[in-house]
Regions:
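Glycine-rich, basic loop-to-helix element that forms the pyrophosphate-binding segment
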Residues: 57-74, 319-336
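A recurrent flexible, glycine/aromatic-enriched loop bordering the glycosyltransferase active site
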Residues: 64, 72, 123-147, 151, ...
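Short aromatic/hydrophobic "clamp" motif used to bind/position activated sugar donors
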Residues: 79, 341
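Short, acidic, metal-binding catalytic loop of nucleotide-sugar glycosyltransferases
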Residues: 16-25, 272-287
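Conserved donor NDP-sugar-binding/catalytic core segment of glycosyltransferases
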Residues: 91-123, 348-393
């Protein structure tokens, strides 16, 4: 625990919260040359306990040097990071110790947390997602309590002075790059004190920390061999990874359609034509083919216009069977030339010119099975923030919330792992689709994307929702939106749902997908 000029009551409470723990521990305190007599008094009293060791720096060195001093002195197999004015829950170390005993190969562990004010009132519980490496790149979500295998913390170089202010984020990025197992304890075991001027109370309180975090993420990308640039997100302490995709990579876009028209923003449009127009006009990735799988009722003038727009980049595939969205997607995949596939509903419109780069590039990274985008309704509200499966609900995170809503703990602003993705905009590879057997044709209209997502996740692959990649989805203007009970029962009988979604445990509004 690094200490510097801590208010007496807060320091005493922090130390007491450790001393009351029932598990075996040592508390290593490093005082960074505090001048306060109260700090010296509290530490002198604390070190009377044989479980407490206090080191005193002669010269103030800052949080990174102080933390490294503490790490160098640690005797335990694991180190837990505690700020000098925060609190551990009474059962904290006992729960941590039990978890470490259950999984001997744990190298990094984190818990849920809340905030506590000067009056001792607890609020703002952060029920965190399970291990989400993409979210960690975009947000230091694991926070407190973080428990790291001591040997690994030292092996990666400890705390980096270049990351002053975001040194924990930098360290956790380095540790998790090598960790054999990362475990989340879904229990509030840490209380983050919110005082004026602290990041707990105001995320913009330390702008230098945001910049340090941005640089830490960039170094992480370089170590991981991820071709891209870390940029600032929409709010302080959020980041975006802008990935690079080799222009030579061919992408096949598969669009099932019946060729209908609909009113959008007061004007009637041919939906599939305007989607293709937006792709060809806006996409900055040019090596594409567009496979349109159409039913016989599709008007000939629509087919003619698609051919005129796309020329050799358009492939029209006739589908003569009864309506089956899943079958049409599978037919489109078989007709496509590329290894990398992007499935789009015909009632979409591109907003982000780099949508193909940002959806396809992650598929080259180990363990990524599919990606999806941020989808908006015509009125700008959020339509898709990833799938959430919990307690019998099959939902879209953030469905219908304002488009500028940051979501619970900024979940709608940062890219992250999720339990599933809508097939309205889903990127994957031919290899993955063949591995899982494609779309389930027993589900012709609804929940086929839920089934596909569960199959992909069942192969141990991750699904990423890419927050900075946006398209409009004029949902169901081209088909009957009705959900049949038998469809729901089919997918529930096959897969069920957990009680709590591992990637989105709180803050969603239950709505059928």
């Amino acid at each position: 625990m690094p200490v510097y000029e801590t208010p007496e009551a807060a320091l005493r409470s922090a130390i007491d919260s450790v001393l009351c723990q029932r598990a075996s521990f040592e508390l290593v305190v490093v005082d960074d040359a505090s001048t306060s007599p109260a700090v010296r008094e509290v530490l002198a009293e604390a070190e009377k306990d044989p479980r407490v060791r206090v080191l005193r720096r002669a010269i103030n060195g800052g949080i990174v040097k102080t933390s490294n001093d503490a790490l160098a002195e640690a005797n335990g197999e694991f180190v837990a990071l505690l700020d000098h004015d925060d609190l551990l829950a009474p059962e904290c170390l006992e729960v941590v110790e039990r978890t470490l005993g259950t999984y001997p190969d744990i190298d990094y562990l984190y818990t849920d947390e809340d905030k506590v004010d000067d009056a001792g009132q607890h609020y703002d519980v952060f029920a965190k997602p399970d291990w989400s490496p993409e979210r960690l790149r975009c947000q230091m979500y694991t926070g407190h309590l973080s428990v790291i295998r001591t040997s690994l913390a030292r092996a990666v170089g400890g705390f980096d002075e270049r990351a002053e202010g975001s040194q924990d984020h930098d360290l956790v990025l380095k540790v998790t790059e090598r960790a054999r197992r990362v475990v989340h304890i879904p229990q509030v075991l840490y209380h983050w004190r919110a005082i004026p001027g602290s990041v707990a109370m105001d995320q913009a309180a330390k702008p230098y920390a945001h910049d340090a975090g941005l640089a830490a993420v960039q170094r992480h990308l370089e170590r991981m061999g991820i071709r891209g640039v870390a940029t600032s997100g929409e709010l302080p302490h959020t980041y975006r990874v802008v990935r690079h995709l080799d222009p030579s990579v061919q992408v096949s876009i598969v669009i099932p359609t019946r060729g209908p028209s609909a009113l959008v923003w007061g004007e009637r449009r041919s939906m599939v034509v305007e989607l293709v127009r937006s792709v060809l006009r806006l996409s900055t990735h040019r090596n594409i083919e567009i496979v349109v799988v159409y039913d016989p009722p599709t008007p000939q003038d629509v087919l003619d216009e698609l051919t005129r727009l796309g020329g050799e980049q358009i492939r029209l595939v006739r589908f003569d069977e009864p309506f089956n969205f899943s079958a049409k997607c599978n037919v489109g995949m078989l007709a496509a030339s590329a290894e990398h596939l992007v499935f789009l509903n015909d009632d979409m419109e591109v907003v982000s010119p780099d949508f193909l780069e940002q959806l396809v590039a992650p598929l080259f990274e180990e363990g990524v099975g599919a990606t999806g985008a941020r989808l908006l309704f015509a009125d700008g509200s959020l339509q898709h923030g990833g799938h959430v499966y919990a307690s019998g609900d099959l939902t879209h995170a953030g469905f219908g919330t304002p488009g500028d809503d940051e979501g619970p703990f900024r979940a709608y602003l940062v890219s992250r792992e999720c339990s599933g993705l809508t097939a309205a905009c889903l990127a994957t590879t031919r290899q993955v689709m063949e591995q899982v057997g494609g779309f389930c044709e027993d589900l012709p209209s609804n929940f086929n994307d839920v089934d596909l997502s569960r199959k992909i996740r069942g192969e141990g692959l991750r699904m990423l929702w890419i927050a900075g990649t946006t398209l409009y989805h004029f949902e169901s203007v081209t088909r009957d939106p009705k959900v049949h009970e038998w469809e729901y029962e089919y997918v529930m009988d096959r897969w069920g749902t957990p009680k709590v979604d591992p990637y989105f445990p709180v803050g969603y509004r239950p709505v059928f997908v």
